Every structure is written in C-alpha cells, then in structure tokens.
Amino acid sequence: MMFRTLDDANVQSKRVLVRVDLNVPMANGEVTDLTRIERIVPTIAELSRKGAKVILLAHFGRPKGVASDENSLKHVVKPLSKVLDHSVHFAEDCIGDKAKAAVDALKDGDVLLLENTRFHKGEEKNDPEFVQALAANGDLYVNDAFSAAHRAHASTEGLAHVLPAFAGRAMQAELEALEKGLGNPARPVVAIVGGAKVSTKLDLLSNLIEKVDALVIGGGMANTFLAAKGLDVGKSLCEHELASTAREIMAKAETTKCAIILPVDAVVGWHFAADTPHQTYGVDSVPGDAMILDAGELSTDLIASAIDDAATLVWNGPLGAFELRPFDTATVKVARHVAKRTKEGKLVSVGGGGDTVAALNHAGVADDFTYISTAGGAFLEWMEGKPLPGVDVLKK
C-alpha cells in the first residue's frame, strides 16, 4: 500500500491540522496511561521542528455533541506538554471564533490543542459544513490516529477530501507493520485468536482462514469449537448456539488449507477466581461440574511448535482467563516464546486489541514484539479485511 507521509509534505510556516488519538484513560481528571500520548510525540515534534504551526484535533469519550468538563481535552494539556517537552496552547473550541483566534496567534513551531471534536454533532456525522469549519484553520492535514481510522468522521476522513492529506509517523508505523503482518507477509503465517466469545469475532475468523496457514483458537472461544466437535466442556463459557457456525468455519478452513489448532488439554477450575483449586484434563475428559480456564501444557507446546514453523505471527486475544492467576500460564508462556523467536530474528510478530496489549504487558514482552497496535476497533477491522476510511483517503 502506497500512502503519502510527512516526507512528501512542505510544512514550513503552514497551519497543519493533525488528527491524533488522545482518548487516554483518566481517573479524577488525571491521565493514568501515557502510551497514546507517547505514540504521537514523533509527529508533533517533527512538525514543530520543521517550523509548522501544529494544530491538534482529537476526540475524548462519547459526549454525543454536548460539551462537558469531564470530556474536555483541557485535562490532557499538562501531560501532553510534559511528554512532548514543549508548551501546548489550548483553545476552548475546535471551530469558530475561539479556534480562529488561537490559530491566528500561533508562531512557527508552536503547538495548539483544539477542544474535543465530538462536542459538535457534525464530527460523527462527517457533516460537510463542519468539515469546512475545521479546514478553515488549516493548510495541510495529517492523520496520526490509526485507532480512529475505521470511522468515517469529519476529523478522520472528511478533512482529507478538502486539504492535502498525509500520514503521520505513528500512522505510518502502524500501516507498515500491518502490511508485514497480513498485507504481504513472509510465510508461513500463524494467527492466534483468543478471548471470550466467537460471536464477536466471526468476521475475523472467516477472513483469517483465507489468509493464514495456521489458526490457533484459544480462550473461551475454543470451548465453542470443542463443543461443536461433540466434546463436553462442562460448565465452561461456551456459545452452544454457534456450534454449527464453528463447524462451518472448520470446514471452510479445510478447503483453504488453513490448519486450525485447538487445545488438546485444559486447566479446569470449579470457581471463576484466582488461585481456585485446579487440575489439567484432556479436552475429551473435562468434568461436567468444572470450567475450562486455560490451555494446558500439551496445548502450549503444540502452539509453540506452530510458532517455530512460522515466519509471521498475528495475535489477537488471550489464551485463557489471564487476569486470574494461575490461568495466565498459557498466555504468558506462548507470549514469551513469540518474543524469543522475534528477538532471534526468526519471526515478525504483530499483536493488537485491548486485552491482547494488557496480556502481553502482563507477560512482560510487549516491547519485544515487532509491533503492538494500541488500536482496538481499527486493528480488529483491519484483521477482518474491512476497508478503513481514514486510511483509504491517504493512499497515493
């Protein structure tokens, strides 16, 4: 995929509207995780260094077109300034007189954060009038928010039709990593898909079995597939009503020559709680009163072996109830094996999705993967093979 980057833009003395992701976790008006802020620093710093007037656009929360203190981006100014090591101005609106006055006051190299775009209903409707009102304060548009690229909103897609549009460095890194993961990957490719429910990942599974050489199914999702094969999963989380769908996916995988890897043994417990008594059973002998809470040792060895044969790995979702020890064992063990193969230069590894990032951080290996995507919905839709409006408009 070819797309325009900052290398193609002349930004000196230009007003550059930069769409960023500042939808950061907050508690009592304080930012509790700086990851998303840290990701946008390279783009902002580069534009400022090159003499642009940097104007940041972002949403926060779901205010539905109504301004409120709790969803104001003013709370992000201080941590953003600190991480950026550069003063950040703030405007109390993203359009109109307040925004214009703040933009007009900027000198080359200055950074300005405009108020939450979602305080206006036109943002989520991609309303042409709202797009023009935003565009009035810019000469160029840079999108650095891959996490919002699956939404065709005014600040993520609309602006790219009315101003020269470029990908920021975080967006560029994400797109290049994803291209390595599924776009044009080194083969064989293995995908790990875990998490609780098959119902939320049907499109994902259907797309992957056409693109990967092996598909590892773990977490609560695996129980639905085991049940579909006629196995008793006891009191495990299981969507029995999707048994026929699971069988269809397995049948389709046979025609596309995609090997499906399911657990062969499971760690079961009798209560959904940390440190509850637990035991390992073959998946064909799970006690009727127990629930599967993690993949067993034979299963993790099987997954590790598939990873050893792979050149590329894409991971979305944990292999067990990783938030409850000791049911994090399979996820941690496999994650560390992926990290080891990646560090040895034998594997390109891409992971993404909320629970996945938390699980890989828990295993202490997030930094050892080739790339970790912090984009939840956009990463999933990319894995599902769906078009991303915010990306498509940046293509050359």
Swiss-Prot record:
It is an enzyme of class 2 (transferase). Pathway: Carbohydrate degradation; glycolysis; pyruvate from D-glyceraldehyde 3-phosphate: step 2/5. It catalyses: (2R)-3-phosphoglycerate + ATP = (2R)-3-phospho-glyceroyl phosphate + ADP. Belongs to the phosphoglycerate kinase family. It holds the Pfam family PGK. GO terms for molecular function: ADP binding; ATP binding; phosphoglycerate kinase activity. One of its GO terms (cellular component) is cytosol. ATP binds at K201, E323, G353, G354, D355, T356. Monomer. The keyword Acetylation does not apply. It comes from the Bacteria. Its main location: cytoplasm. GO terms for biological process: gluconeogenesis; glycolytic process. It is found in: Cytoplasm. Its EC number is 2.7.2.3. This is Phosphoglycerate kinase. The gene is pgk. PANTHER family: PHOSPHOGLYCERATE KINASE, PHOSPHOGLYCERATE KINASE 1, CHLOROPLASTIC-RELATED. Keywords: ATP-binding, Cytoplasm, Glycolysis, Kinase, Nucleotide-binding, Transferase. Substrate binds at D21, L22, N23, R36, H59, F60, G61, R62, R118, R151.
